[in-house]
């Protein structure tokens, strides 16, 4: 069993986004991080599974795909799943599953969340809990630690209370338990609901944009992408305008199809309007086009440094991450 467990605010945020967005459906995913000083640090998550209102499981195929996504030095260090409206507890299936995990990795962690409890003023301990297993019984892990602070003190999980945006913040200092769980805030700009808005033509989804959105999401970014964000019955124009306003940057996937479409160009106009206010927000990606073709559409965009899909999707993802991390320092 790990002596301590730390989890980044980014990983918590990913879990909340994944589980709250699923509504009544149970979801599951993997915890990604690395061992540290006899314990485990959870840096981010990889959402893997959508189940039903009664059941969810992570398949061997999903685990294999997740392993292929790992960066150098990263490991799968645990799993999480949601119980919407049911409270936080380990079922007998959870116990048996986690015992199998512990057989090959004694540091493996399990996190259970009831996203329906993530309401304003509610203690985080009421809806998020870590578990391990001992003697065929679940053992809840208590105690939270705030890192990156000169005050290396322990915090009772009940003192992390949900704010009006649905994320936990620490309010009152107390002393808490044995196994330590750290709570560390992301350096991404919290004033925006999304880190990036993806502006694209529908025809580019299948072979490029969908995978780009999924990879950015797996890296911990809050992504406004229509297939992630829009629901049946949503007002398309209003939802897009709302997404543009609440996004820190706009990724514009420029392609031949993009230049032919009206909606993507309206989205681009919205991003250009934000830049008129003195904010650099447009991150251009060239997909299957030349500089001359971009020039014929917009000389301003042609003179922007852009990432090209010809160099591979991982290159594009890394270039976007590099810009965002540079701006968040």
UniProtKB/Swiss-Prot annotation:
Residues 192-324 form the TIR domain. Transmembrane segments: none annotated. The keyword Hydrolase applies. The active site is at 267. Keywords: Hydrolase, NAD. Residues 5-134 form the MPN domain. Gene3D superfamilies: Cytidine Deaminase, domain 2, Toll/interleukin-1 receptor homology (TIR) domain. One of its GO terms (molecular function) is NAD+ nucleosidase activity, cyclic ADP-ribose generating. It catalyses: NAD(+) + H2O = ADP-D-ribose + nicotinamide + H(+). NAD(+) binds at residues 201-202, 231. GO terms for biological process: NAD catabolic process; signal transduction. It is an enzyme of class 3 (hydrolase). Its EC number is 3.2.2.6. The keyword NAD applies. Pfam families: JAB (PF01398), TIR_2 (PF13676). The TIR domain mediates NAD(+) hydrolase (NADase) activity. Self-association of TIR domains is required for NADase activity. NAD(+) hydrolase (NADase) that catalyzes cleavage of NAD(+) into ADP-D-ribose (ADPR) and nicotinamide. This is NAD(+) hydrolase TcpA. It comes from Theionarchaea archaeon (strain DG-70-1). The lineage of its organism: Archaea, Methanobacteriati, Methanobacteriota, Theionarchaea.
